[in-house]
């Protein structure tokens, strides 16, 4: 029951998405932001999932009809014909590159690996991840790989052949499934968001998980870490949270940003899909159900610049902003 709900939610989020390049022009108060749509006919589908830039500068665009690689001029599509063994599930959620330049592909039904030189996709046989709806892949600095999905958290060290489950429990002591987001801090902790189960910290050295028992944090959905080390938590219905000294003992402290009806510069919507920092502008970009919010002052919850969809050239094309990516050349993509 829970797995079917997770898949349905992913599908609704991505309907009608357009990939956009964003150009910023100075203005008197907030900067003017213009959205330049990428031609949709170069993609296998407009149902775009989580964007990713690899070490060679290519932008990878997972869709619900295969995977596209964009080089700034055009796109190459990878689908079922590129699989060397087995059947490639073209409902692609996420990709990530390891230190050997393998591109790992997470789909609604398992894990695949792309050889970037040959273009072949290998259907790796990982029985523990068979039919797993993979939501997040984190390639670690030691060339280990972490996988999160509707079957929980998995890990593969650099020398391992297989992935191994990492048992973690929420604040009620129940096993955590439906992992939706993972980030790593500089203290060897993983921060984990699990749908309807909350925020957890997993100490890699101790092999131990700590659950954040808080009504707002129990709605954690997506995580991000800025250049200053701040951890941001986007929730499913409770806005955005910035953790304050998260490793301190006692209850988890945070700054809460949420939508306030009638306040123009509060957060646009409390259902959050993605968070990305633009360090050059010192802003936090937040994608959600109703559009895009840009936070200009982290100490002021009323400093959001909000964007709704419009019909004019340069307007946001659609309301739901599922993925935000800052590329190494400083451009923002949604």
Task: Describe each region flagged by the PLM.
Residues 1-334:
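Carboxylate-rich, polar loop motifs that coordinate divalent cations or form catalytic acidic clusters
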């Amino acid at each position: 029951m829970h797995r079917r709900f997770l898949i349905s939610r992913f599908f609704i989020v991505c309907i009608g998405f357009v990939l956009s390049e964003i150009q910023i022009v100075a203005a008197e108060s907030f900067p003017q932001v213009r959205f330049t749509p990428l031609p949709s006919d170069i993609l296998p589908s407009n149902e775009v999932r989580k964007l990713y830039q690899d070490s060679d500068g290519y932008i990878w665009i997972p869709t619900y009809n295969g995977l596209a690689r964009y080089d700034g001029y055009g796109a190459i599509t990878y689908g079922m014909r590129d699989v060397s063994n087995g059947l490639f599930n073209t409902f692609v959620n996420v990709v990530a590159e390891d230190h050997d330049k393998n591109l790992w592909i997470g789909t609604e039904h398992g894990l695949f690996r792309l050889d970037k030189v040959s273009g072949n996709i290998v259907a790796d046989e990982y029985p523990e991840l068979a039919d797993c709806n993979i939501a997040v892949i984190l390639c670690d600095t030691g060339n280990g790989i972490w996988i999160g999905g509707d079957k929980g958290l998995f890990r593969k060290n650099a020398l391992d052949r297989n992935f191994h489950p990492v048992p973690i429990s929420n604040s009620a002591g129940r096993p955590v499934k439906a992992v939706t987001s993972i980030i790593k801090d500089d203290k060897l902790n993983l921060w984990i968001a699990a749908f309807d189960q909350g925020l957890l910290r997993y100490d890699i050295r101790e092999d131990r998980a700590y659950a954040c028992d808080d009504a707002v944090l129990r709605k954690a959905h997506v995580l991000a870490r800025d250049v200053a080390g701040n951890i941001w938590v986007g929730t499913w219905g409770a806005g955005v949270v910035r953790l304050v000294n998260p490793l301190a003992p006692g209850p988890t402290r945070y700054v809460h940003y949420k939508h306030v009806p009638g306040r123009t510069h509060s957060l646009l919507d409390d259902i959050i899909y993605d968070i990305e920092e633009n360090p050059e502008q010192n802003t936090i970009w937040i994608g959600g159900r109703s559009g895009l919010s840009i936070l200009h002052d982290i100490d002021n919850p009323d400093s959001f610049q909000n964007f709704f969809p419009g019909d004019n050239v340069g307007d946001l094309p659609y309301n739901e902003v599922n993925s935000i990516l800052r590329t190494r050349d400083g451009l923002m993509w949604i």
